[in-house]
Swiss-Prot record:
Species of origin: Pyrococcus abyssi (strain GE5 / Orsay)
Classification lineage: Archaea, Methanobacteriati, Methanobacteriota, Thermococci, Thermococcales
Name of the protein this chain belongs to: UPF0235 protein PYRAB05010
GO cellular component, one term: cytoplasm
Family designation: Belongs to the UPF0235 family.
């Protein structure tokens, strides 16, 4: 669910669009992914843009979707942070 790489940390997330608020819901143990609630609808990339904005604000870093542009399951790179910082911000 979290993997430290040279560029930063890769998060494996599952996005739940149309939520009441943007938030980290918890961990989906079965899928091995972090559950992220996003207010935006999954239409024309709105949920992806909102996910990037939410995670960028949470970590204070640049965020990029590496895999899963059209799926709810995504691999996201948070640049310039380490694993401990990500765990602390996610409260894991």
């Amino acid at each position: 669910m979290l993997k430290e790489v040279r560029e930063g940390v890769i998060l494996r997330v599952i996005v739940k669009p149309n939520a009441r608020e943007n938030s980290i819901e918890g961990i989906d143990e079965w899928r091995g992914r972090i559950k992220v609630n996003i207010k935006a609808q999954p239409v024309k990339g709105k949920a992806n843009r909102e996910l990037i904005k939410f995670l960028s604000n949470l970590f204070g870093a640049e965020v990029e979707i590496l895999k899963g542009e059209t799926s709810r399951e995504k691999d996201v790179l948070v640049r310039g942070v380490n694993l401990e910082e990500v765990k602390r911000r996610l409260k894991l």
